[in-house]
């Protein structure tokens, strides 16, 4: 089987799960709210909720997680090894500006493409690059 066909079949197989995980992150209004900051949630409850969702997803996919006082978190493949490969992403968003004609915190499809707050920066990439 050609590699491109294998990749296409794999994407078709996992896309519903990937889309569900992205939708769960998009659904979190993770705009910084320093007035509501608290221990473990220094950026406010929205970013804390988004971090919790991302960590839950990582654990569900078999990764080990670490939360450093709500400021930063990471997920790691279990086991040991000399090599390190890191991907960096964030799951908070800036406030939704004007121009949204639908709920920005609901993943929708428009003209065959997914649309939602934080989809490209950085919720989608955070799901796709654990």
Language-model segments: residues:
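Acidic/His- and Gly-rich active-site-bordering loop/insert found
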Residues: 2-119, 123
